[in-house]
């Protein structure tokens, strides 16, 4: 779960290579080791070449984010599914266990000991995270993956204007163009979805049910846009004061959300034997359990792959990859979940894809202009914070 991500919100980052880098990512071996004989040296050299290969990093990042979205959609797509808080609690528990295991065997070396004072200060951010991930799963439950992916772009607009209001940010004319395209793609997607619902059923009652489902999905999506922007802006404000390093924010986010999610599940969700049987039918029970466990590990994978991508490329390339990755995520919904393929839905995906490219281009130009000017402030977010944030979204 971590900061859930899979959603590629672009945050300003330095392009000069001074960002924090994940210490567990493999580095190129020294020249003396490369000249040695024996299979061990050859294997190490091959692994080092892969670890420093930009296409491999980009592919790993794309596959991890796509798989996270697909798995989340699969788990919450059951007709009787109503245990979202429980699902998110399992994600957080699996993620914490994975982090502690990686620390124990030495893969993660820079995780600070738990601090009660920091936990109290970070707890409000974790509450915002609960709101973001819960509304995200509810929206994904009622909407198709392409529509969900397209509407997530609206969060970028909310964050941009939140930065203008609270952090003195600015929005360039090119960014405004991308925002217009994002809104247009959302309108086209909603129109295509509604048309498909109206004409897709053989009986008026089916169309009415489909419209009600879409309305619920749009309502949850609107709340998710608000919660996502509040969480990311709140995290930006607090993270500098906390002096969190690579894995600290992921660790605290998951650890602090576990009790909240468990309490919410016990209070708000039905734990009767009959309801558990409806949520976990025998024919798909094992697959659901595997998906829930993978979703927790997926947060680690996305964080690792995004940090890897940042390390071997540039933040501009990383932002562009995030924009381009919207297309395969949307297509995955068409492939795996039989989302309606209509002229409207395809047009919405294409417009959303173009809006992401335009936005990434706008951020690249803004970053280039900032580098040519004298620095007046510190970068707002490190590579590790960016990677943890991406693990939020799927």
Curated annotation (Swiss-Prot):
Residue span of region Disordered: 371-394
Bilayer topology annotation: Multi-pass membrane protein
Main localisation: Golgi
Segments on the Lumenal face: 77-80, 145-149, 199-213, 268-287, 340-342
GO molecular function, one term: GDP-mannose transmembrane transporter activity
Subcellular location: Golgi apparatus membrane; Cytoplasmic vesicle membrane; Endoplasmic reticulum membrane
Keywords, sorted A to Z: Cytoplasmic vesicle, Endoplasmic reticulum, Golgi apparatus, Membrane, Sugar transport, Transmembrane, Transmembrane helix, Transport
TM ranges: 56-76, 81-101, 122-144, 150-167, 174-198, 214-234, 247-267, 288-308, 317-339, 343-362
Superkingdom, natural source: Eukaryota
Residues in the Cytoplasmic compartment per record: 1-55, 102-121, 168-173, 235-246, 309-316, 363-394
GO cellular component: cytoplasmic vesicle membrane; endoplasmic reticulum membrane; Golgi membrane
Cysteines paired by S-S bonds: none
Biased composition (Polar residues): 374-394
PANTHER family, per database record: SOLUTE CARRIER FAMILY 35
Complex and partners: Homooligomer.
Similarity-based family: Belongs to the TPT transporter family. SLC35D subfamily.
Described function: Involved in the import of GDP-mannose from the cytoplasm into the Golgi lumen.
Protein name per Swiss-Prot or TrEMBL: GDP-mannose transporter
């Amino acid at each position: 779960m971590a900061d859930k991500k899979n959603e590629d919100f672009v945050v300003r980052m330095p392009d000069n290579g001074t960002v924090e880098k994940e210490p567990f990512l493999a580095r190129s071996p020294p020249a003396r080791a490369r000249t040695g004989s024996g299979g061990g040296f050859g294997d190490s050299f091959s692994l080092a070449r892969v670890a420093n290969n930009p296409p491999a990093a980009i592919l790993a990042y794309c596959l991890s984010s796509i798989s996270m979205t697909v798995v989340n959609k699969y788990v919450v797509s059951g007709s009787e599914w109503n245990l979202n808080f429980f699902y998110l609690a399992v994600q957080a528990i699996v993620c914490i266990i994975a982090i502690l295991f990686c620390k124990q065997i030495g893969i993660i070396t820079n995780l600070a000991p738990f601090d009660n004072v920091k936990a109290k200060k970070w707890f409000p951010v974790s509450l915002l995270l609960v709101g973001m991930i819960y509304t995200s799963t509810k929206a994904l439950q009622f909407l198709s993956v392409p529509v969900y992916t397209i509407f997530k772009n609206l969060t970028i607009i909310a964050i941009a204007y939140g930065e203008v209001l609270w952090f003195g940010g600015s929005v360039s004319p090119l960014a405004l163009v991308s925002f217009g395209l994002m809104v247009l793609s959302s309108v086209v997607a909603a129109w295509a979805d509604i048309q498909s619902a109206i004409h897709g059923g053989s009986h008026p009652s089916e169309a009415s049910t489909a419209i009600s489902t879409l309305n619920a999905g749009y309502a949850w999506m609107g709340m998710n846009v608000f919660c996502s922007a509040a969480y990311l802006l709140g995290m930006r404000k607090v993270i500098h004061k906390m002096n969190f390093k690579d894995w600290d924010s992921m660790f605290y986010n998951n650890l602090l959300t576990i009790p909240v999610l468990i309490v919410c599940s016990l209070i708000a969700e039905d734990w009767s034997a009959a309801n558990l049987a409806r949520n976990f039918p025998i024919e798909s029970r094992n697959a659901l359990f595997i998906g829930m466990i993978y979703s927790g590990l997926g947060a680690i994978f996305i964080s690792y792959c995004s940090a890897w991508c940042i390390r071997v490329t540039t933040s501009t390339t990383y932002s562009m990859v995030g924009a381009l990755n919207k297309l395969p995520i949307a297509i995955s919904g068409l492939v795996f979940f039989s989302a309606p393929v209509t002229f409207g839905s395809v047009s919405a995906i294409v417009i959303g894809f173009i809006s992401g490219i335009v936005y990434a281009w706008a951020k690249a130009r803004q970053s280039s202009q900032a580098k040519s000017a004298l620095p007046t402030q510190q970068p707002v977010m490190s590579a590790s914070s960016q990677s943890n944030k991406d693990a939020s979204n799927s």
